């Protein structure tokens, strides 16, 4: 049942679209943009709604009520969301790439993703505990493996 191989992002139903999200949590990390170079930097400061143990939003359905600036990834905006990590399934499929070998749709569970180091599990701190975002810049969210 490899629906992502037979359908475009636009052809997917809501359940298929949502299942593409591996739950890595990288999109919920605070990001900084250098004013001079416009380079994007990830931090290990996670949204206050992100559970650091499993990478899930604790209020996913109502997240916009709690965090109005939260961005919903859609087929209409995925091309513009250049801050999505290269490992993101939405980004990968949009760019014509395959899902990685560790993706839950391939393996049947999220464990392979965690073992591969592709999630935020046990790597983040809550944004409410961060004083200076600049002190929390990290490179690991940029990692992308097949």
Swiss-Prot record:
Cross-referenced PANTHER family: UPF0260 PROTEIN YCGN
Family the entry assigns: Belongs to the UPF0260 family.
Disulfide bonds: none
Source organism: Shewanella sediminis (strain HAW-EB3)
Record protein name field: UPF0260 protein Ssed_2516
Residue stretches spanning the membrane: none
A Pfam cross-reference name: CxxCxxCC
Lineage: Bacteria, Pseudomonadati, Pseudomonadota, Gammaproteobacteria, Alteromonadales
Top-level taxonomic group: Bacteria
């Amino acid at each position: 049942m490899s629906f992502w191989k037979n359908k475009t992002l636009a052809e997917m139903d809501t359940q298929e679209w949502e299942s593409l999200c591996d739950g890595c949590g990288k999109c919920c990390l605070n990001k900084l943009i250098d004013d001079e170079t416009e380079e994007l930097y990830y931090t290990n400061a996670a949204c206050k709604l992100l559970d650091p143990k499993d990478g899930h939003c604790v209020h996913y359905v109502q997240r916009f009520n709690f965090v109005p600036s939260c961005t919903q990834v859609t087929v209409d905006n995925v091309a513009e969301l250049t801050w999505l990590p290269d490992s993101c399934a939405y980004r990968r499929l949009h760019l014509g790439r395959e899902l990685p070998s560790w993706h839950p749709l391939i393996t049947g569970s999220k464990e392979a993703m965690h073992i591969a180091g592709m999630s935020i599990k046990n790597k983040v701190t809550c944004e409410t505990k961060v004083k200076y975002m600049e002190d929390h810049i990290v490179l690991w969210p940029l990692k992308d493996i097949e």
